[in-house]
Amino acid sequence: MLADKLRPFIDRYNELNSILSDPEVINDISRMTKLSKEQRNLESIKDATQRYLSILNGIEENKTLLEDPELGELAKDELKALETELPKLEEEIKLLLLPKDPNDEKNIFLELRAGTGGDEAALFVGDLATAYIRYTEERGYKYEIVSSSEGSAGGYKELILLIKGEGAYSRLKYEGGTHRVQRVPETESQGRVHTSAITVAIMPEVEDSEIDINPNDLKIDVMRSSGHGGQSVNTTDSAVRVTHIPTGLVVVNQDGKSQHKNKDAAIKVLKARLYDMQERERREKESKERKDQVGTGDRSGRIRTYNYPQNRISDHRINLTLYRLDAIMAAGLFDEIIDPLIAHYQAEAIANAGL
């Protein structure tokens, strides 16, 4: 019964009430902050549980009054209202009981890379990045370009954005994977549709305390910054390439105005990539142990197709197809895809958890 699953959370909430009134805890700012955060996270479950138990009691009370000559009709109406509210609240509680992704509230690095398709892939990196920027603006997020490498015919061979905002990772984590585009290039005289692909990686921004990098594991090279077509854009060696020797991961940054800023930005991206690598390894291990696939955007798999001649956008993970590609790209309306994805994975998680 759902009420039995809720009891440990309520017990823990009440226990935290007692702990937080302890003078020793009050004087320990670090512990106080940690425990207060845990209690705040339990607040929604506590409130929903109280309402849930109240509804169950109300249903039982009104059932006993159905035969009452004076209160029977009133009890019938009240019973109907409570029985209508109950399943909605049960679904809400099931979502609250799901394990929280510790990265959900973090800022993200959004990395786009041109794949197969040459110049057309680089152009689509630019188009998709523009659509993501519109999406971030609509949601009230802030963004900045961390690193970019322009394509020879426009667009970008690689582009990394830092997107800041509450819940940025929780929304955009589903964008990680291979995005395929089908359209007629402007240079195509025969009107033939070309297929190209780009990859998107979503990595949470991490605090220094979350991942430790040994300075001896880093190889740092400085070089001349290059712009469109590879030409030099300044006369100082401000571009920085950071190599993490144990993993072979390489980050190049040249968008900052100084070598120091480029080095800091490159190390931030490197930390995010290392953290993301560790998280994926952890998820893969858990997935094998549970023998089920959670899947929040396996970057090796094709997740979405953008077909311009048909004005179609299809997400292959949930078999969702929308014939409004132009509107979605123009206004960054990715919630039309993200919301169904979230609902799908939440339903899957609820089923796997046996709730």
From Swiss-Prot:
Q: Where in the cell is it found?
A: Cytoplasm
Write the record's keywords in alphabetical order, separated by commas.
Cytoplasm, Methylation, Protein biosynthesis
List modified residues, type N5-methylglutamine. 231
Stretches with biased composition (Basic and acidic residues) = 278-293
Any one GO molecular-function label of the UniProt entry: translation release factor activity, codon specific
The UniProt entry, under Gene3D superfamilies, shows: 3.30.160.20, 3.30.70.1660, 6.10.140.1950
Which terms in the GO cellular component ontology are assigned? cytoplasm
In which family does this protein belong, per the annotation? Answer: Belongs to the prokaryotic/mitochondrial release factor family.
The function of this protein is: Peptide chain release factor 1 directs the termination of translation in response to the peptide chain termination codons UAG and UAA.
Protein name stated in the entry: Peptide chain release factor 1
* Organism annotation: Campylobacter fetus subsp. fetus (strain 82-40)
Q: Which gene encodes it?
A: prfA
